[in-house]
Amino acid sequence: MDFSSKSLELCKSHSNQTDQLLKISKQTYEKYDNSLSKLHLIIRELNKQLIILKETSTQFNDRYNTFINDFTSLSNQKQSLFTSIENKLEILKKKYLDKGLVFKNNNNNNNNNNNNNNNNNNNSNKSTEDDNNENNNNNDVNKNNNNNNNNNLNTLYDFIDIESLELIKNQFLSELSGLNEICDKSKQIYKSTNESNLEMENRFLEIQKQYNKQIEESNSLSDLLTQQNNLYKTIQNQLINVASQCDFITFYKPSPSPLSPSPSPSSSSSSSSPSPSSPQQQHDFNINNKKEQIQLLLTSSLENIQLMSKNVKDIENQFKESCSIYTLVYLLNEKLSFGNDFSENWETFERFNCIFEQRLAGANYFIGELYSLGKWYDLFDESYDNLLEEVKRRQKEYLRQKTIAEQFNEELKHNYNQEIQNRLKFYDSYGKYLPVSLFSTISDQPISFQVKQIIEESVIDYSFNPLNLKRSSPINQQQQQQQPPPNS
């Protein structure tokens, strides 16, 4: 095969390669462009889902923070309240009772009980001696119990029902422990959910970063495609030029030249190189020149083809990088599809919320009871101090009224004696001269009056006894106050 045929074969091969490379470049760039468009839509949709997820997570976090705030508030109140109650109880322990008040009150109760028992025995005509002995024994037992109770009552603290107080405290601590357990379980859900959300957010940011990088590089890729088109045109022009040169070599024939004398041997030997002086030599020179041009063109076209191949690889690599974003998108979408897990966590959290509200209501109720007890302990202490003042006031009032009564008794006695003297004087002066039938009561004694102390059971019904805290809790007192009074 001659030079022209080989060159044309190379031209054909180069042309096919350039066609294929340009086609691949255009197809790859089109795929790349479509990929970026799809990525734009996918990223926008992912952003919407992440916004919804973030809003839901915000609600979740708000509720969790409410849990923590409520629990922390109760814990702080517990510490201060328990300390306050302990301090108040210590004050009550140091507040010693006036034994005169306690023993006097119980002795009066014993006397009333004995009087009631005696009245019952007197009214029972059919009661036997054994019954009387049993009543006497009961009176002795009651008396001993009262004495024992009096011996146990030394301070105001002895009136406090510690068992009920400890029961309320333990119930409050139980509710608080339940709240703490719910907070711990909610914290685990809160932590795992936030970690998952943070991971998805970081993945989305990475996708956005890669996408923005592809957008920036898309301009260079467009320039690369333009370069491919220009290289394609250059190679085609070079191949056309090669084909033209090959046609020249194939079809070119030198024109006949006039006869010339043959060169002398001396002249031929003296020439060092052939010169294109003859037509044949000129023809050979042109042919060689064309061959050199063809080789240069083929070499240049091959270099351009290699450059096109390199550009194709760059375009394909860029497309592969864009496709790698789909792997990140797939992973994020798979993570977002954990909606079932999130729904289960949300349902679990809703159940925790219901339990938390119930326990919170119970804890608030018991802490309210403890606050009420603390307030009543203050009122008890204050009331006892006022009770001592009231006893002094009553004693003073009793002495005042006693003084008035004694003075009035003296005045009544004086008036009575004065009345007797007046009647005797009237009788001596006039009465003895009158017939008895006319004034039969003339010798009667005057009616006497005197003031005496009357001791009877109190008719005042106190619906609230501030000293009997064991039998009158703040709750019972409130219920009693809310009940309507009985019809008289």
Swiss-Prot record:
Single GO biological process annotation from the record: mitophagy
A GO cellular component annotation in the UniProt record: phagophore assembly site membrane
Topology of this chain in the membrane: Peripheral membrane protein
Skewed-composition ranges (Low complexity): 105-126, 134-150, 265-279
Function: Autophagy-specific protein that functions in response to autophagy-inducing signals as a scaffold to recruit other ATG proteins to organize pre-autophagosomal structure (PAS) formation. Modulates the timing and magnitude of the autophagy response, such as the size of the sequestering vesicles. Plays particularly a role in pexophagy and nucleophagy.
Homology family: Belongs to the ATG17 family.
Protein name: Probable autophagy-related protein 17
Organism: Dictyostelium discoideum (Social amoeba)
